[in-house]
Amino acid sequence: MGDGAEAAGATAASRFGTICVFCGSNAGRRRVFGDAALDLGHELVRRGVDLVYGGGSIGLMGLIARTVLDGGRRVVGVIPRALMAVEISGESVGEVIVVQDMHERKAEMARRSKAFIALPGGYGTMEELLEMITWCQLGIHDKPVGLLNVDGYYDPLLALFDKGEAEGFINSDCRQIFVSAPTASELLTKMEQYTRLHQEVAPATSWEISELGYGRTPGADQS
């Protein structure tokens, strides 16, 4: 961990050694989004958490990655080869794993992480968030999922989830799969306290997803 301000503000170590953060390759039009990415990065460092992210060096991705790396934590970026010229500007941040497609990217990020957080972002960020929620519902993983609702950015999405529950498309227990909060500190505290309440559709070992380690030879690396 880094010294100085980070060390002075240290808190108890998180039970999550590594957290995957989904976020935009754009910074957004308002400073509040960039500030939130920086704050989350500092909070991960304070709690002794390493970062897995989408591998870009621009937008919110670049901000949080540089913050965590500068704080002395490990940063691993996972990026499809086709997006390297688009999402990496100048030097990459931390370690970079190049994959073939978006599915492999998400699976590799999930395999390497103990929890997931979504910062504001566009279609890609929302799709990644929803896939991790769906995988949890199906029983593919049981890792906490957090939504950092910066300045109400995700209020319409949360309202849609509430509508889905009210109309009978989302089970009430599945509505509790993820937690949300307006600040990084509050969100991570909620995630530390998260307990699964929903009934999984099928156990993780019944899913043949080699990228996540299911169906692999026993003893294979699943760090």
Curated annotation (Swiss-Prot):
Stored Pfam families: Lysine_decarbox (PF03641)
Leading EC class: hydrolase
Gene Ontology, cellular component aspect: cytosol; nucleus
Keyword Aminoacyl-tRNA synthetase: no
SUPFAM superfamilies found in the cross-reference section: MCP/YpsA-like
Keyword Membrane: no
GO biological process: one example: cytokinin biosynthetic process
Tissues and organs where the protein is expressed, per its UniProt entry: Expressed in roots, leaves, stems, tiller buds, shoot apex, immature inflorescences and flowers.
Function, in words: Cytokinin-activating enzyme working in the direct activation pathway. Phosphoribohydrolase that converts inactive cytokinin nucleotides to the biologically active free-base forms.
This protein's name: Probable cytokinin riboside 5'-monophosphate phosphoribohydrolase LOGL7
Native organism: Oryza sativa subsp. japonica (Rice)
Gene from which this protein is expressed: LOGL7
